[in-house]
């Protein structure tokens, strides 16, 4: 199976496909890679010329082209035959509303649990953890939004503490409690800095999920929750939710190694770093697998749940002990 996630970031370049080779020409010269070894192509270049032959051959090989602005996807070019399993597509469309809601609830529960797990790792003394834990493990309405707000507050404080000029904070009382509520970080699709690092990481995650969906014949254009909000591949956005903390952890590690906010930019070095997270090994069920393998396992479970209308086959990923170790 194809496995390379190719990032195109040259300021000015030309992309084409000749003799089965993805070809990129830029001021640095010409680089080639067999298209059959490519899972997806992420284009963040400010000025890239894309030859029509690349679109044609990418479609034949099942390769998604993800075109970004400010390091977040704005266009997804998918193969026309993205779902060759007609029975599966019909089953997905015919899911009863109750089943769809249950599948989404399992997804949200896993995402919130994963955010809690990561927050406990990066900020074990943060006073806001208790409230996050109650919500993440509970059944509050709109728990996804509540957990997200709490998680990003904790994440923002934890990353700002990595800056050498940030005053030392204490977990309770005094300066620590005050500073913990005054993080300057806000998670948005814009904003630069950490947001750019996260956006690019999520684009890598999206491309990995898309590859697995194509592999099992699931049409990513039909989702279980994101359909009203996303215009392209809502199912990919749905199933990637529990894996977002994997990107968040990768970004946190980068910030730990590069504590000056001036270095929080999407550089070539960062791209190489973040695109490696699908190869990290984590626990899933009774196995230790690469994250990309876990994604495939989750997608296959979702496929079976859809075909047999039994939500028990869908088992979103939650981290085991030691997942967030350095």
List each language-model region with its residue ranges.
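Active-site helix-to-loop segments that bind/position phosphate- or nucleotide-bearing substrates
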Residues: 2-13, 17, 25, 33, ...
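A positional/architectural concept
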Residues: 8, 17-43, 50-51
């Amino acid at each position: 199976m194809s496995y390379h996630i190719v990032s195109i970031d040259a300021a000015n370049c030309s992309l084409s496909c000749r003799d089965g080779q993805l070809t990129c020409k830029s001021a640095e010269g010409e680089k080639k890679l067999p298209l059959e070894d490519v899972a997806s192509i992420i284009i963040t270049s400010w000025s890239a010329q894309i030859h029509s032959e690349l679109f044609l051959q990418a479609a034949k090989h099942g390769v998604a082209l993800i075109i970004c602005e400010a390091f977040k996807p704005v266009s997804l070019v998918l193969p026309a035959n993205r779902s060759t399993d007609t029975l599966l597509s019909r089953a997905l469309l015919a899911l009863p509303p109750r089943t769809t809601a249950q599948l989404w609830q399992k997804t949200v529960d896993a995402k919130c649990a994963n955010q809690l797990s990561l927050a406990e790792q990066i900020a074990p003394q943060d006073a806001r953890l208790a409230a996050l834990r109650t919500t993440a493990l509970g059944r509050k309405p709109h728990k996804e939004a509540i957990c997200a707000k709490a998680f990003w507050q904790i994440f923002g404080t934890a990353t700002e503490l990595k800056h050498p000029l940030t005053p030392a904070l204490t977990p309770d009382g005094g300066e620590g409690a005050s500073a913990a509520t005054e993080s300057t970080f806000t998670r948005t699709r814009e904003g630069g800095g950490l947001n750019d690092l996260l956006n690019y990481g999520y684009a890598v995650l999206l491309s990995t999920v898309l590859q697995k969906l194509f592999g099992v014949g699931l049409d990513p254009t039909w989702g279980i929750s994101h359909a009203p909000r996303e215009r392209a591949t809502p199912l990919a956005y749905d199933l990637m939710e529990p894996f977002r903390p994997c990107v968040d952890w990768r970004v946190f590690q980068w910030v730990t190694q590069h504590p000056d906010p001036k270095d929080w930019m999407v550089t070539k070095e960062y791209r190489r770093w973040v695109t490696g997270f699908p190869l990290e090994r984590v626990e899933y069920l009774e196995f230790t697998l690469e994250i990309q393998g876990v994604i495939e396992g989750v997608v296959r479970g979702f496929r079976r749940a859809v075909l047999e209308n039994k939500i028990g086959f869908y088992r979103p990923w939650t981290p085991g002990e030691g997942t967030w170790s350095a």
